[in-house]
Amino acid sequence: MCLFTFLATGIFKFENYPKTMQLTSPYNRPAKLTVFIMAFAGSLCLAQSPSDFSVKTDKLLYQSTMDSAASVKDWVMEGPGHLKFADGWMEMRSPNEEMHHVYWCPETFPSDFMAQWEMQNQHLEAGLCIVFFAATGLESEDVMDSSLPKRDGVFSQYNNEALKNYHISYYANTPKLPARAVARLRKNPGKNIVYEGPPGINVESDRAHKVTLIKNKAHIRLFIDDRLIIDWIDDGKVNGGPLDAGKIALRQMQWTHFRYRNFKVWSLTSDN
């Protein structure tokens, strides 16, 4: 993290996290001012390469170019998500904005990993993007285990019923809450907000962005390009200890139309 982001993040935490890791009122004026400070500070930072994320990667566990149906042939769509492949990208949306949808990577990843993907907004009017990770059944079953309840994109099926996971909303621009001022990390089941940081992908941005998600033991971070928006250590006070190995999924709400490419996941070295 660069100096400007470090200082701004410190201000944000001081104002909003004195006793808990949650904002009591993220939409008040001081919070909005702090978010602006953090966004400005992030823009001053020097660009970072993957080696600059203060973590050592080991093996490349999985990669998909996401540029053809063959490149995602083992992925599983839940809900009415529609895919289109063009110009080296995978577009994902719900026809007629029918319903939310979740797209599961087929691999189960270890507790400690770094994942990266690129994405670009194709519909600036509205949308919401989430990443689920460390996802399993409540008894650590594979999320695709046939004994688990069927899922079709309804949110409660992922955060309140039969699964445990973390999820981060890193682009949030819904009709009821346009240009939401924070990114959120929740620990499930229970939709427990455990951390709120500065906004993720700018709602007015139509350029491509690189998302980097790092889970190093109990430490969870998420970057949009070189900008740190989530930085939290799971102390086990919510839903028990840190979650372990599990699957990753990309979720979009019904209004969302993004395109994706170059999804990669690395393991981390033991000396992180």
What annotation goes with each model-predicted range?
Residues 22-35:
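Bacterial N-terminal signal peptides that target proteins for export
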Residues 34-43:
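Bacterial N-terminal signal peptides
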Residues 49-77:
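Extracellular carbohydrate-recognition regions
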Residues 66, 115-117, 207-216, 220-222:
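Short tryptophan-centered beta-strand motifs in secreted/extracellular beta-sheet-rich domains
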Residues 82-99:
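Short carbohydrate-recognition loop motifs
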Residues 186-210:
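Short, aromatic/His-centered strand-loop micro-motif at the edge of beta-sheets
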Residues 233-261:
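Flexible glycan-contacting loops in extracellular carbohydrate-active proteins
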